[in-house]
Amino acid sequence: MKKYDIAVIGAGSAGLTAARLAAKFGVNVVLFEKHRIGGDCLYTGCVPSKSLITAARDIYKSQNLQKYGVKATVKLDFQAVRNHIHSSIHHIREHDDSRKVLEEAGIEVVEESVTFTNKSTLRSASGEEYTFKKCIIASGSSPNKLNIDGLKQEHIVTSDTIWSLNKLPKHLVIVGGGPIGLELGQAFAMLGSRVTVLERSDKLLGRFDQEVSEAVMKGLKESGVNVLLNASIEEVREETELKLSIKAGDKTEMYVADKVLAAIGRTPNTSGLGLEQADIVFDERKGIEVDDKFRTTSKNTYAVGDCKGGPYFTHLAGEQGATALVHGLFGSKRKVNWSALPWVFFTTPEVAHVGASESELLSSNRGYETEILNYDQIDKAIAEHHEGKVTILLDKKRKILGATIIGENAGELIGYYAYIMGAGKKLDSLAQPIQAYPTYAMALRQHASNVQTKAFTNTFIPKILLKLRGY
């Protein structure tokens, strides 16, 4: 039997963050991973999807250079795109997530599945037992399965399995209009696939304000994606080709497709861990029950990342892993600041958000002021032919309640507002540092300065000060 201070189950973002931090503090840590070190983010999520999106955008742009007087004919080599994706994965794995790198950092890595035998012991698939003082479960999540009568599994791909496609689909039907479905759908459309997205509700990205939904819908249509709202697959026919009877609203049409992407959410991975043996309460659909420090109902065990339920973000999983680790070791009062959690959708246009939406503030009857910066006021955006909009919701003291950015670099820029919110500062703080011109950061600084100046000049103070100084 081997003894450890910290045992971590799962080598995705949450587990790796916790294990690395534990090793830096000098405690004895073991990391278990039954599949691949790096988790979904590295192999089937963030890294491959963003590599695909980058390739798709570049290829799409190369076909649309008429405004510069360039006429080009582009021939796609899908295998080259796949090579680019796998190269990105390999590079990140080798310098960041390999077993060698982790062991050099002082982490013992066990590439086996484990189960709880009691509240302080784990048993590996090979029969080895490990005791721990604290355990952090970071077992991740899996794509929900699509079950439609007549639709064979060989025709279905998920965000996990779509990367094994050897050729570009002629027609990809996507069930689910969330971020994953929209990002992948638009990327495949830019590469040349015919893409149809089926969203069961009457609005895309329902959590967000109508303006976001409309902007994304417009961008999808411009890149060739056919979005059907209030839509579902009613019938499946398998003849010489796959035929889908799709109902959208009160209209039903037959579509021919070669692949169906199931993008209908994710389910926490809780089975096979022996959670019952450690008296850990969980729900197969919602995940492992935790408190605000991510402690489970077994006081020495924590659950972080996807296994405790959404939101399913890599950056959030990492933050939870660190929070659980420092609480387990030091009893830290550190908590995740949910109000300053940024969301980014890597569609074209890119969308980023932090804090409350306007509809949420309206429904809660909370007062706010709206400040808007359009991209046609940003010199860099004008030079690069980018359209977009920054919307900031402020309280009376100019503290940020929420911010939404639609347009180029939205994901990079939202970090400014997330930091200000997380630090409890005013928008004014963004006006303090000098930014280089011409950059988007400079535009955000100038906008914050304008808001601050407007608020100041609307008071009686400037007039009194000027009069006292003889003006």
List each language-model region with its residue ranges.
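FAD-site-proximal beta/loop scaffold in flavoenzymes
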Residues: 152-169, 254-330, 416, 431
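A Rossmann-like FAD-binding core segment of flavoenzymes
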Residues: 72, 108-111, 115-124, 192-292, ...
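Beta1/beta-strand and adjacent pyrophosphate-binding region of the FAD-binding site
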Residues: 1-12, 168-175
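Short hydrophobic core segments
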Residues: 9, 114, 130-140, 174-175, ...
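Glycine-rich dinucleotide-binding loop and its adjacent helix/turn
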Residues: 46, 139-194, 198, 226-227, ...
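Flexible, glycine-rich terminal cap/loop adjacent to redox cofactors
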Residues: 7-35, 47, 51-58, 346-357, ...
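Glycine-rich flavin
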Residues: 2-4, 20-27, 32-168, 201-205, ...
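Short glycine/serine/threonine-rich phosphate/pyrophosphate-binding segments
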Residues: 14-18, 40, 156, 181-184, ...
